[in-house]
Amino acid sequence: VPTTGKIFFEGKDVNEIGLEAHRRNNVAFIFQNYNLIDYMTPAENVMLTSKKPPIPELIKVGLTEEEAKRNVLKLSGGQQQRVAIARALASEAPVVLADEPTGNLDEDTAKEITVLLKDSAHVLGKCVVVVTHSTEIAKQADVVFRLTHGQLLTLEEAEKARQVESVE
């Protein structure tokens, strides 16, 4: 494991621009525990990361316009997860890091969110990294990294990734 060196993103040394600035400008997160601003509405949470109108972004992930205007604490866990997903996908960041993004969603909604994540990569050109234990989600990946106890076990390209039996 490297302990020294430099990290470059789009040709720029991340340390020179600052880690905080790099994260703010280049990386959007979908946290497993949502990390929403709890005194705001879903629409206000999305507006934190995007100049796009928030309601259409929230509708894309399955919320109604009425739900988009409620306080986030009045939403179910699955609805809060959708807000976190909308917030990340609406951002201008070229990288999306998603920790179990479909963990609290029903099967149909999880499939819809997976399509949105894939479209973000294939249509919008974002780098989408998903951490998951779901075999079904892993099968949708272009590349699968299998980790065990923090160590890289295997790296599988698109076709082999679709044949994944189980994810540990």
Predicted features along the sequence, with ranges:
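Hydrophobic anchor residue at the start of the ABC signature
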Residues: 85
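Conserved ABC ATPase signature
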Residues: 71-75, 79-81
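ABC ATPase NBD coupling module
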Residues: 14-28
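Conserved ABC transporter NBD signature motif
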Residues: 4-13
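Catalytic Walker B motif of ABC-type/P-loop ATPase nucleotide-binding domains
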Residues: 96-99
